[in-house]
Amino acid sequence: GDLNRLGIDVACDAPGVGANYHDHHGAAVTWYLDGIQGLDGQDRGRNALRNLRDYVLHRRGLLASTHVDAGACVDTTGSGRPDVQYNFAAFAPAGPDMPRLDGNAMVMNTTIMQTRSRGRLGLRSGNPADGVTILANALDDPRDLATLRRGVRMACRFYDQSPLREVLGAPIWPPAGLDMSDGSETFEAEIRARAESKGHPTGTCRMGRADDPGSVTDHAGRVHGVPGLRVCDASLMPSAVSANTNLP
């Protein structure tokens, strides 16, 4: 394993450490707003100062909100169990790979609730300051890709319903005219390019029975074979819950 490769003394042989990495992955279905003002620009200039003042002095305003105005957990297969989570917000996501838009927009974050793909977390070097390597393997399992396809298609149907459609302009993503059928390679490429972590990495010290070579802890987070050591975060979940991982 990583310890032997890096010349680190092994106190306990636990091959499950770092395995079973998974996350909630999704994509941001985004459209321009038309004729109404969203939240874009509220974090800059005078708007930012006004919002800060309202919160500091009165505990009200935008900073007193999560900015996620609505959400839904939806069964896209008819199985009786929700498999896609939606979160709605009146602004467009931005980041290193997604520059700010010129206009107002709204986003429907579309997230897989039961991730099947599994990756691995590893050591970069023997120096703990160097951080770790992460092989996410996002959408590696075809069931995850199929779920996100269904979720994105349903999100677009939501956008096309009245009265929401009356305040929307052009689609940003998925782009207008995209073939979103199951067999569309273009749709698959778009989803793979846009898929992102929703911030719920889980599972790399999963709990289980002591005779299970892939388990790391027991049900109370006690590490097998290392007295006095516990794991107390979401890494001990064998599978991520079908919700934000801070919920339990």
Question: What is each of the regions a protein language model found here?
Answer:
Residues 1-52, 62:
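Glycine-rich loop(s) and the adjacent beta-strand/alpha-helix scaffold that form part
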Residues 33-38, 51-248:
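FAD-dependent oxidoreductase catalytic-site/capping-region signature
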